Amino acid sequence: MAYPFQLGLQDATSPIMEELLHFHDHALMIVFLISSLVLYIISLMLTTKLTHTSTMDAQEVETVWTILPAIILILIALPSLRILYMMDEINNPSLTVKTMGHQWYWSYEYTDYEDLNFDSYMIPTQELKPGELRLLEVDNRVVLPMEMTIRMLISSEDVLHSWAVPSLGLKTDAIPGRLNQTTLMAMRPGLYYGQCSEICGSNHSFMPIVLEMVPLSYFETWSALMV
């Protein structure tokens, strides 16, 4: 859950988001070391009186500043590729939910059930109850079972949208005429908020996403009532 004046990322709720946080720290540490080295060299150049105006060739230095950046890029690229392949893997999902973007709301269809579908609109500010979040609450939450692999099929009925839930490490484009897919798994119950992350018109800011992750028994009860 995000909070006011937050500087860092949201707490991870899924294995993918945990991996993304670790990769973020890994890349940030490399950037910090590079920046420190550059600042150190600049400070030496500004304070030393030694000059090398007559140097015409320095193959050793050129070799170092060619090989070292290549090694650094490999250290960043390999973990990144690993996470990308992990995000693309969808093995034996327990549930499939189809999400369609509209101007300016989301519709959901539980494809494993015969007649379980609904639209999800933002609740206007004047209709919010005490404790509810402005611009983030919806009239119909997406209820899903926790600790289970869920496949999300995402598309759009009109313009480009993007279905994003930061704490789960999810951000998938909703493209008209194209069906994208992603997978999610929440490790603990709760409400997880997201928003459309692709500018899609005048009410782009009013397309929130709310996932309600519950134990499997609660989900089965809810789905039976909805059907």
Swiss-Prot record:
Amino acids binding Cu cation A1: 161, 196, 200, 207
Positions bound to Mg(2+): 198
Mitochondrial intermembrane compartment segments: 1-14, 88-227
GO BP term, pick one: ATP synthesis coupled electron transport
Catalytic activity: 4 Fe(II)-[cytochrome c] + O2 + 8 H(+)(in) = 4 Fe(III)-[cytochrome c] + 2 H2O + 4 H(+)(out)
Record key words, sorted: Copper, Electron transport, Magnesium, Membrane, Metal-binding, Mitochondrion, Mitochondrion inner membrane, Phosphoprotein, Respiratory chain, Translocase, Transmembrane, Transmembrane helix, Transport
Superkingdom classification of source: Eukaryota
Modified residues (Phosphotyrosine): 218
Gene Ontology MF term list: copper ion binding; cytochrome-c oxidase activity
Binding annotation for Cu cation A2: 196, 198, 200, 204
Parts forming coiled coils: none
Function recorded in the entry: Component of the cytochrome c oxidase, the last enzyme in the mitochondrial electron transport chain which drives oxidative phosphorylation. The respiratory chain contains 3 multisubunit complexes succinate dehydrogenase (complex II, CII), ubiquinol-cytochrome c oxidoreductase (cytochrome b-c1 complex, complex III, CIII) and cytochrome c oxidase (complex IV, CIV), that cooperate to transfer electrons derived from NADH and succinate to molecular oxygen, creating an electrochemical gradient over the inner membrane that drives transmembrane transport and the ATP synthase.
Name listed for the protein in its UniProt record: Cytochrome c oxidase subunit 2
